[in-house]
Swiss-Prot record:
Cellular localization per UniProt: Cytoplasm, Cytoskeleton
Record key words, sorted: Cytoplasm, Cytoskeleton, Microtubule, Protein biosynthesis
Ranges for domain TCTP: 1-170
Major subcellular site: cytoplasm
Entry GO MF terms: calcium ion binding
Name of the protein in its database record: Translationally-controlled tumor protein homolog
SUPFAM superfamilies assigned: Mss4-like
């Protein structure tokens, strides 16, 4: 099993147990689902009486996103201006990390070009549709995971910056 950690702060963000699709060589997308968390069903083995009304108890179940829940991602908010300012600093930090790790100048240039194109073509036009999440540590300098819904309006998916993840085999 592979766990993908934030390269800047070490937060666990995703694993290969989710179907990761690489998009444009710059991000990973992972489809996720809304699951019911905390529902407990107690079966005491008794037959329900036809005369008694069924008891409807609130069992504390809540619908949560499976990736957000599994990796304890923390919801955060941005307006377009503050997100783009954050992203500028984040991309500089990733570039520095790539240089530190010995990536070639061509790879770094490809990252910068690809990231800029992805932001311009995908994030900015759909900005109002995204939800934003940080890792468990809530480090403001770490990766902000994007969550949106597919064209069907029902299937949620998350977006992770490929170069901002470090693969760890477990």
């Amino acid at each position: 099993m592979l766990i993908y950690n934030d390269i800047l702060n070490g937060d666990e963000l995703i694993s290969d147990s989710y179907d990761l699709k690489e998009v444009d060589g710059i991000v990973y997308e992972a489809d996720c689902a809304m699951i019911e968390e905390g529902a407990v069903e107690v079966n005491i083995g008794a037959n329900a009486s036809a005369e008694e009304a069924a008891e409807d108890l609130d069992d504390g179940a809540v619908k949560v996103n499976n990736i957000v829940n599994s990796f304890r991602l923390q919801s955060t908010t941005f307006d377009k201006k503050s997100y783009l300012a954050y992203l500028k600093g984040y991309m500089k930090a990733i570039k520095a990390k790539l240089q530190e790790n010995g990536s070639s100048a061509e790879d770094i240039k490809a990252f910068e070009t690809g990231a800029s194109k992805f932001v311009k073509d995908t994030i900015v036009p759909k900005f109002k549709d995204f939800e934003f999440y940080t890792g468990e540590s809530m480090d403001p300098d770490g990766m902000v995971v994007l969550l949106n819904y597919r064209e069907d309006g029902v299937t949620p998916y998350t977006i992770f910056w490929k170069h901002g993840l470090k693969e760890t085999k477990v």
